[in-house]
Amino acid sequence: MSAADPDAFYRDRVPAHWNRTVDAQERAAEGDAEARRLLDEMQRVRGTIDVVVTGGPTARRYHLNIRAGRMSADAEPVRAPFLVLVHDLDTFATLERESGDSVLGFLGALAGQAGEMKLTATRLQNLLALSGSARLELTGGAPMTLVAHFGPETEQDGPHCSLRIPSDTYAALRAGELAPQEAFLGG
């Protein structure tokens, strides 16, 4: 896969990584009531995340469907997306590097989670209550811009807010060395 072609990333790697996270939670749930509760919540998730990659001759849209907690990349969404992520081809290499196999891992770092974000039915309900768009920008090094649209009909709107984060600050957030409030309040 080249930096200019995100197909394998969104069609194969992201769903495979997501499903490995569910597999790991299934193993953790054996004999652990709290891990079982979390797994049950993860398995109740049914929804769609769309990713739109702009640039090139046409924009590409990937439908990442989640059924019973497991993700697949499909030709059509199973539901209206609760989250639409938009980025261009020029920043794909940075996004791929910063997120590893999971774009939600990238977003989880911004929320202060050092590990993989585990989407539960409760978290999904909270996301469904959101309506708006935000632009996330990594600055310094290899810059990157990602727009996240939450809620119906927000994809047509421009971002309602922008977050600019230096790459070194993001690295500290991702490693769990810096709390989000410290990063954002510290400027």
Can you say where each PLM-predicted feature lies in the sequence?
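Feature captures hydrophobic
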Residues: 1-186
